[in-house]
Amino acid sequence: MGIRKHKPTTPGRRGSSVSDFAEITRSEPEKSLLRPLHGRGGRNAHGKITTRHKGGGHKRAYRLIDFRRNDKDGVPAKVAHIEYDPNRSARIALLHYADGEKRYIIAPNNVRQGDRIESGARADIKPGNNLPLRNIPTGTVVHAIELRPGGGAKIARSAGARVQLVAKDGPYAQLRMPSGEIRNVDARCRATVGEVGNSEHANINWGKAGRMRWKGKRPTVRGVVMNPVDHPHGGGEGKTSGGRHPVNPKGKPEGRTRRNKPSDKLIVRRRRTGKKR
């Protein structure tokens, strides 16, 4: 993938850039793998906003992605196409299996149209192949990793994501995350060899707010510039600081707090935060 910079013909185009889509081999998706996707605008079933800054955006169709790949062990597949997916930053690869079935997967880096891919414990260690962590050599870079055996890939699915398998200790495999965190994962969990493609996505300059609106992202407004009816920090004469400790729109404290999770016992080393503990 490469990035194409726009000429400064307008203020919105100045400095902006876009992917050149050089790796895309097909413009139309596989119809049998499409499902309708209805925009919720950040609302729940009662019509209340549960996630702010969402709404609008271009109409999309959801592409069904195979995040498990455990029912195709031993069945070879050929990469038929590399396609664009509006629902994620990574590209997707359309696989044609030897038994006639077609499926989408996250497109790994350096996987091209016509390549052969397989899954299973005996699969070769090459980009795109999917196998359990206990069958992958230490030091290998992987992506699309399960957190529970058979649960489907949850970790490292976005563009350019890469996780390194640093050690194996009994029933666990130790993974170094992009954040620098090292954590234990069940060695029976599956992962795909290689890193996710489209790594230049992070370097795209979106240029103007309108391009964010096309993606369904609405503006983020600070609470201190709202009215009292809209936010606990709102109101006051002139420019104010909010007059209280930071809270969210519902009045619950924001910022420093404890957010321990049940999986903390599996974390070997914390991620780099830059904070003194």
UniProtKB/Swiss-Prot annotation:
GO biological process, one term: cytoplasmic translation
Entry keyword annotation includes Ribonucleoprotein: yes
Compositional bias ranges of the Basic residues kind: 37-58, 268-277
Keywords, in A-Z order: Ribonucleoprotein, Ribosomal protein, RNA-binding, rRNA-binding
Region of interest (Disordered), ranges: 1-58, 223-277
Annotated GO CC locations: large ribosomal subunit
UniProt-listed Gene3D superfamilies: 2.30.30.30, Nucleic acid-binding proteins, Ribosomal protein L2, domain 3
GO molecular function: rRNA binding; structural constituent of ribosome; transferase activity
Entries under InterPro entries matching the protein: NA-bd_OB-fold, Rib_uL2_dom2, Ribosomal_uL2, Ribosomal_uL2_bac/org-type, Ribosomal_uL2_C, Ribosomal_uL2_CS, Ribosomal_uL2_dom3, Ribosomal_uL2_RNA-bd_dom
Compositionally biased spans, kind Basic and acidic residues: 23-33, 251-267
Family, as annotated: Belongs to the universal ribosomal protein uL2 family.
PANTHER family hit by this protein: LARGE RIBOSOMAL SUBUNIT PROTEIN UL2M, RIBOSOMAL PROTEIN L2
Subunit structure: Part of the 50S ribosomal subunit. Forms a bridge to the 30S subunit in the 70S ribosome.
Known role: One of the primary rRNA binding proteins. Required for association of the 30S and 50S subunits to form the 70S ribosome, for tRNA binding and peptide bond formation. It has been suggested to have peptidyltransferase activity; this is somewhat controversial. Makes several contacts with the 16S rRNA in the 70S ribosome.
HAMAP family assigned to the protein according to its UniProt record, in alphabetical order: Ribosomal_uL2_B
Record's protein name: Large ribosomal subunit protein uL2
Species annotation: Saccharopolyspora erythraea (strain ATCC 11635 / DSM 40517 / JCM 4748 / NBRC 13426 / NCIMB 8594 / NRRL 2338)
Gene name for this UniProt entry: rplB
